Structure formats: structure tokens, C-alpha cells
Swiss-Prot record:
NDH-1 is composed of 14 different subunits. Subunits NuoA, H, J, K, L, M, N constitute the membrane sector of the complex. It is a peripheral membrane protein. NDH-1 shuttles electrons from NADH, via FMN and iron-sulfur (Fe-S) centers, to quinones in the respiratory chain. The immediate electron acceptor for the enzyme in this species is believed to be menaquinone. Couples the redox reaction to proton translocation (for every two electrons transferred, four hydrogen ions are translocated across the cytoplasmic membrane), and thus conserves the redox energy in a proton gradient. Belongs to the complex I 23 kDa subunit family. It comes from Mycolicibacterium paratuberculosis (strain ATCC BAA-968 / K-10) (Mycobacterium paratuberculosis). It is found in: Cell membrane. Its EC number is 7.1.1.-. One of its GO terms (biological process) is aerobic respiration. It comes from the Bacteria. Gene3D superfamilies: 3.30.70.3270. This is NADH-quinone oxidoreductase subunit I 1. It catalyses: a quinone + NADH + 5 H(+)(in) = a quinol + NAD(+) + 4 H(+)(out). Keywords: 4Fe-4S, Cell membrane, Iron, Iron-sulfur, Membrane, Metal-binding, NAD, Quinone, Repeat, Translocase. [4Fe-4S] cluster 1 binds at C54, C57, C60, C109.
Length: 175
């Protein structure tokens, strides 16, 4: 009889839980909140006129302790200009199979071309898809930006880009 009462007491917890509203996450349909300072996926940023901030210096690759970043630089020409400097990152890859999310690459970047955004959905069933290329890492073009390659904003120099002196305004006036 005593064991039967213990059994009923145990089932009482089970039965009370059966009729409560389930506490589940509706994750695929409704993503959960992300902390404002959460660092997830990397992003290559652009200047206000659409040129890329990456100058192909490879400092991010040198700073990465996991050797997850590969950068191959090329020279800009006046006919094809991708960044305001003399070079740009022609090939830029981050291997998320190796990345440990330490942020050393962000600290090493002299032009703040590389940042980490709140995107955390990077899972995939194919290992090759976890090596993100430049096209996946570049920030999308905003209104008022032109897709590179294009010349620098009229009347501006490389120094103006790094000081952000009226680049967006000069670019809008040129159109």
C-alpha cells in the first residue's frame, strides 16, 4: 500500500505537467531574441558610395589563431576600382569550420572593413558551404550606393574616404 501511494504521488507530477501549456521555442518560424552585443557571422563593410572598405592588407588573416581566413589581394586601377586604396581583397574567404569567433580579425582590421553581425544561422549539411566567400560576406548595397567597380567620388582622395569627408554627398551629386 505504501509503494502504491508513492507511485500515485509520482504520477501526480506527470499528470499535472501533461495539462500545462508547453514551454517550447517556435525557432524556425519565430527566431529568438539576440543580445545586442552578440557577435555572430562576419561581414565585409562598404563605404557610403558602395566601394569596399577591405584594402587587401591580410592583417585579419595574420591575426586569426585558427587560420580560418584567406585573403588574396589585387591592385586597383582607375578603370576598375573596388576600394579607395591602391589594393583590394580580390579573394576573401572565411572557413566557419575553423573559426572560433574570437574577434581578433576585427581588432586587426585597419579600415574597420570586417565586423561581426548578429546572424547566427550558419549551420549546413555540406562542409563546403561553410566556407563563405566574398559574395556572401559583403554587406548589401544600400540606397545611394553604386556597385563596384566604379571611380571614387568626384573630387575626393583616399584620405577623404578614411575621414568620411562628404563621400556620400559627393556621390549623390554626381548622379
Amino acid at each position: 500500500m505504501f509503494t502504491f501511494l508513492k507511485l500515485i504521488a509520482g504520477f501526480r507530477v506527470t499528470f499535472s505537467a501533461m495539462f500545462k501549456k508547453p514551454v517550447t521555442e517556435g525557432y524556425p518560424e519565430k527566431p529568438g531574441p539576440v543580445a545586442p552585443r552578440y557577435h555572430g557571422r562576419h561581414q565585409l563593410n562598404r563605404w557610403p558610395d558602395g566601394l569596399e572598405k577591405c584594402i587587401g592588407c591580410e592583417l585579419c588573416a595574420w591575426a586569426c589563431p585558427a587560420d580560418a581566413i584567406f585573403v588574396e589581394s589585387a591592385d586597383n586601377t582607375e578603370a576598375e576600382r573596388f576600394s579607395p586604396g591602391e589594393r583590394y581583397g580580390r579573394v576573401y574567404q572565411i572557413n566557419y569550420l575553423r573559426c572560433i569567433g574570437c574577434g581578433f580579425c576585427i581588432e586587426a582590421c585597419p579600415t574597420r572593413a570586417l565586423t561581426m553581425i548578429n546572424d547566427y544561422e550558419m549551420a549546413d549539411d555540406n562542409r563546403a558551404d561553410l566556407i563563405y566567400g566574398k559574395d556572401q560576406l559583403l554587406a548589401p548595397l544600400q540606397p545611394g550606393m553604386a556597385a563596384p567597380p566604379h571611380p571614387m567620388a568626384p573630387g575626393s582622395t583616399e584620405r577623404d574616404y578614411y575621414l568620411l569627408d562628404n563621400i556620400a554627398a559627393a556621390n549623390r551629386e554626381a548622379r
